[in-house]
């Protein structure tokens, strides 16, 4: 009986939703990576798609608390705490070698200040967001969006 409840809660409908959301995230990332941002006419499309990507990434991986349902919580509920821990450890690792800012903090800063909420921003916030975004789309640096996606998908 308990096994049937477990399957109905975690393997059937929600597992399909998790798979669908991860597929959508991967699709959005793939489309994002195909946009040539050096051409001015592509920059609005890039920002539009980046917002969509980041909102979903935030919902899937950056939520904390008992009321939100992240991928990490999903793995914990399935008894695969080790995967959830690896994801969290990675997201809590340093984004840059010269500061203690984590990958989670950088992505959440952009998502919360510029995508998911309409928070008051300062010129410093805007400059920081521009720096973070230019870093994320730069193929020649560590912890860019490609590295983050490859690492996350490698863990799950």
Predicted regions and their residues:
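Long, charged low-complexity segments
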Residues: 105-116
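Amphipathic alpha-helical interface segments
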Residues: 1-106, 125-156
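Intrinsically disordered, Ser/Thr/Pro-rich regulatory regions of eukaryotic transcription factors
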Residues: 119-120
């Amino acid at each position: 009986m308990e096994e049937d409840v477990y399957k109905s809660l975690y393997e059937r409908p929600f597992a399909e939703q998790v798979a669908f959301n991860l597929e959508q995230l991967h699709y959005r990332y793939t489309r994002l990576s195909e946009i040539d941002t050096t051409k001015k006419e592509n920059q609005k499309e890039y920002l539009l798609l980046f917002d969509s990507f980041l909102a979903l990434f935030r919902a899937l991986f950056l939520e904390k608390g008992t009321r939100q349902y992240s991928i990490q919580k999903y793995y914990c509920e399935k008894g695969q705490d080790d995967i959830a821990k690896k994801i969290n450890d990675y997201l809590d690792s340093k984004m840059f070698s010269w500061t203690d800012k984590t990958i989670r903090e950088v992505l959440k800063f952009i998502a919360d200040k510029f995508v998911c909420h309409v928070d008051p921003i300062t010129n410093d916030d805007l400059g920081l967001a521009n720096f973070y975004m230019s870093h994320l789309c730069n193929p020649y640096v560590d912890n860019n969006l490609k590295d983050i996606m490859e690492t996350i998908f490698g863990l799950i």
